[in-house]
Amino acid sequence: MRKTIVIHVDGLTGRSFPELGNQTLLQSARTPYLDHLACHGELGRLGVPRELRRFSGEMALLAFLGYDPHKWYTGPGPFEGVSMEVVLDAHDVAYLCHLVTLRGEDGWGDGKKLGSQLFMADPFGGGVDTEDARELIDTINEQLVSENIQFYMGHHHRHLMVWVGGSSKVVCRNPQEALGQPIDTYLPTGDGAQIVRELMEASRPILCHHPVNQERLNGGLKPANCLWLWGPGKPVELPPLKERWPGKGTVISPDGPYVGVGTTAGLQTVKVENAGEGDIAWLQALAKMTSTALETQDLVCVHVPFYAWLMIDEQAQPPTTLVEYLERVDEHVIGALEQSCTAKGSHRLMVMCTPFPHQQEDGAAAMSPFLVFEGENGNPEHPHLTFSEQEAANRPLRDATKLFERFTADK
């Protein structure tokens, strides 16, 4: 069976930058390994026909594994629950429950009411660590838990809320969308939204006056002073991948919902720690982990969450810095794994790049370019081809849900 590596660079495409001459990051960065693979492989663009939700994150992995998101993707919440080993009943609704930092016009805004007077200062709760978060979530559980509402401890700012028999029709927004903005237009709406808002508002006085946050303020840190509930969904039971494919596979990612998709499909999973600011050592370790896993696995999907590096300490990273991060990914992940595939001779390498899931996109930049490298094929037909959104735009849209079937049919 031919072995396959899938590298998913998530949150890379999505916009062009005036500072880069209105080019995208892929156009501006020096990416010799990606360009070489594009010249010697198949270049195209991925998506799911008739799917209006953005093709990125765990939904992109779900589609690649051959599961139609129209049928199987209800939201990130239940897959986060799987990664946390939380057992959900059929009528439960799982919400991502993030600790965030809200700021008022004259301070941190101690008032309970959520509205236009509060701004999203930090969607990551001021970088709260897991030890502090545990004390905060424990207190939330003591005061807000009920027969129908349950909170589960995760890591850092990321946790889970389960609404037993609740509504999955609430329209929620990722807190990253609201960064630096008044939160009123980002609050939950729709059927059941009032209950979700009330829980978020009830968390405010509990967290604002918690000793952990008082210590954080005294130490010059931002308080994790509100729960933000989003990403609701009911649990899904995916048909096991082994019913369609006899091989063994592994998913490697720092992202809970992404890992949850792999687990639900019956793959092995490795959840790694997040890396700050495109850390080279982390990227090198990720490539080594992938190469090692392929020694015993037939498929390894490795997730590079580029979106996590777009904002650092409430500030958008300069485009030139993002270009540097992309060049690191090209060298230390894609280049390293290309060399590994070439050394083995018969391995397949796929790279897919998807848009940042929570920002306004523009034109061709919003698409998801991909390439498949089956090995050197002599002199390429297009020796000067580069891997970019603009090059992929000239190719027809490929249905992501059909790729896995194609790969597994090729022995």
Predicted segment positions?
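Feature captures the catalytic ectodomains and active-site-proximal regions of enzymes
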Residues: 1-411
